Amino acid sequence: LLEHEEGVRRLITRPMGLRLAPHPGCHMLRPSEVLRLDRSFRPEVLDKIASWAGATVDPGPEWPACCGGGLAGIDEVLSAKLLMDSVRGPQASKVDAILTPCPFCFVQFDIKQKEGVPVLYLAELMALAMGASPERIGLRYHRTKIALPSP
């Protein structure tokens, strides 16, 4: 996706105007010496892509916290604690949603958190910015509803 920035930007028909908290997920960045997608400390890849969609990004922590999704089946208490730690920053900064490309993180943030911060998959953000309707991409199935700006 990063190699196609110009082409992706041309497809944006509805800049989103959302304020998002990027949460790349552990598996997108680590081990950084193997993946070489972004740096583990203060990653910027989601910030960059979100900006293409017309969103602004809350800088968040330098080191993204683990959401605990990978531990959910092993240690529910630790998983819940990690989730709470991950949600605290976005909740305090009152973002419109958490942005993630990770299925574990999505499930944790949408289904298991009790704080009520909405979450968007990266693909959902891009589809909306490219003109897809919320109904078409299934936003109605999200547990925590997101308030989208008017088109």
What do these predicted regions represent?
Residues 1-151:
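Iron-sulfur cluster-binding electron-transfer modules in prokaryotic oxidoreductases
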